[in-house]
UniProtKB/Swiss-Prot annotation:
This is CWF19-like protein 2 homolog. Residues 84-106, 210-231 form a coiled coil. GO terms for cellular component: post-mRNA release spliceosomal complex. It comes from Caenorhabditis elegans. GO terms for biological process: mRNA splicing, via spliceosome. The keyword Coiled coil applies.
């Protein structure tokens, strides 16, 4: 009885893994000078490559495509490109606008052509307990990470964890994750104490139930991450404050910095020079901003104080960070007032904050701000007010129903003896009035415009 060799098997190419082999000298001479003996390798089929390399397979065509293109644009580079596009549109340079838009659409530095591939990779986003938006990492279940009930692999994993990774897991995890972990540990401990002499079948049943619960947790986390990603993406799409948003009212912008911009309000404000300082990057509160963005916002404040001081006027800066979970785009409102009113403003706000919300609160009602970012935890809703360049007050909002969104404007309107319609409802003003207010303040801002230095540095 003869047995057919493996080489003659019809399904041989689908089963056997073909490893790369060096080209022999006699074949290398026939192929040409571009093939070097013993260095150029012959690769197998796609299936054999996948079987041999697994998930780490790198194909030649992918390598060539990655070498031909540039590095992908970072978030900061995209923001800077959007700011340049806005400046070019304000100047009327259409050629530069088209060039920069092509570069932004391509998403690759040094490439002006948009990508030809229609496939799109989406990075899932999520919010941590401090309100920061992070890429959602693929969390594997315990059964995938440690094997099916393998306590030895679990111990090895815990040994390999250093302090930094443990701190990272602690920070990126949410309160709900910790509660679910605590509940599962209680259930597990109760099952262990149930019988001292458990049989092999009981242990197998427990491991089977654990595997089912792990799969259930994995599906639940995937659904939650997709839902949260869609909610965050929706807040980005609907935002009218982001510098690259199509809904941004560009005619209201006074000047654009590196990470922030100054604009007049689109509603009928408390004054014709009622302004807002807005970060170009989407962020729900100023305490989540980077150091350089925070410092840049201080530059706008110094310039505005100088402008209004020349008019013998004072100014009030306030921020209303409400519903941080909804991921709104934060901005600081700037309202000029008469010098006499500015001197009394701190007394009005101090009294109003002490009387707001209920009598019994978990947090201190009135916080005298020295460094706001170190005094209020991230992820909290709060109200903050500053008087000129001096420190002001802050208040942690515990009940949104008892703390109105018009808290600051109502106080300022009362000091200025303005009618209720000025602060009750912010109705969008006519575009002609918006443009008129913006053009008038541009003339006042020109002597202290620190963004001119940025333009001069970019032209050099």
């Amino acid at each position: 009885m003869f047995r057919r060799p493996d080489d003659d098997d019809d399904d041989y190419s689908g089963r056997k893994v073909i490893k790369p082999k060096p080209i022999a000298e006699k074949y290398a001479k026939k192929l040409g000078s571009e093939f070097s003996t013993g260095k150029t390798f012959v690769t197998g089929s796609d299936k054999s490559q996948k079987d041999f390399y697994g998930s780490q397979q790198v194909r030649n065509d992918v390598m060539k495509s990655s070498d031909s293109g540039g590095a992908p644009l970072t978030e900061d580079e995209k923001n800077k490109l959007s700011a340049k596009i806005l400046k070019a549109e304000m100047k009327g340079d259409t050629d530069l606008v088209k060039k920069l838009k092509r570069k932004l659409e391509s998403g690759i530095s040094g490439d002006d052509e948009p990508p030809k591939s229609k496939s799109k990779e989406v990075t899932m986003m999520r919010r941590d307990r401090e309100g920061n938006i992070l890429p959602a990492s693929s969390r594997r279940s315990d059964s995938d990470r440690h094997g099916e009930g393998s306590s030895r692999m679990r111990r090895e994993y815990e040994k390999s964890q250093d302090l930094d990774s443990m701190v990272r897991e602690e920070k990126t995890g949410t309160a709900g994750d910790q509660l679910r972990l605590f509940e599962r540990s209680l259930i597990k401990s109760s099952k262990i104490r149930r019988h001292d002499d458990e049989s092999v079948d009981d242990i197998a049943e427990m491991q089977k139930g654990k595997k089912k619960s792990d799969e259930k947790d994995k599906k639940r986390k995937e659904k939650e991450s997709i839902k949260e990603h869609k909610r965050i993406e929706r807040s980005f799409d609907d935002c009218s404050r982001c510098i690259d948003s199509s809904r941004l009212k560009k005619h209201n912008i006074i000047a654009v910095g590196i990470n922030t911009y100054l604009a007049v309000v689109e509603w009928d404000g408390l004054d014709d020079e009622h302004l807002i300082i807005v970060p170009t990057q989407h962020c729900s509160s100023t305490i989540q901003l980077d150091e350089n963005v925070w410092d840049e916002m201080r530059l706008w404040r110094k310039g505005l104080v100088a402008v209004w001081k020349s008019q013998n006027r004072d100014c009030i800066f306030f921020e209303m960070s409400r519903h941080v979970d909804s991921n709104p785009h934060v901005f600081i409102e700037c309202v000029p007032v008469e010098q006499e009113i500015g001197d009394m403003a701190s007394i009005y706000f101090k009294k109003a904050i002490n009387e707001c919300e209920g009598e019994y609160m978990d947090n201190k009602k009135l916080i005298e701000t020295k460094d706001l970012r170190r005094q209020i935890p991230k992820g909290f809703s709060y109200f903050a007010v500053d008087f000129g360049l001096s420190n002001g007050f802050a208040h942690v909002i515990e009940s949104h129903d008892h703390f109105p969104s018009t808290f600051a404007t109502e106080i300022i309107a009362g000091m200025l003896d303005l009618p209720p319609k000025k602060w009750r409802k912010r109705e969008t003003d006519e575009m002609s009035k918006q443009k008129s207010r913006a053009e008038n303040f541009k003339k006042l801002w020109e002597p202290v415009d620190w963004t001119k230095r940025l333009k001069n540095d970019s032209t050099k």
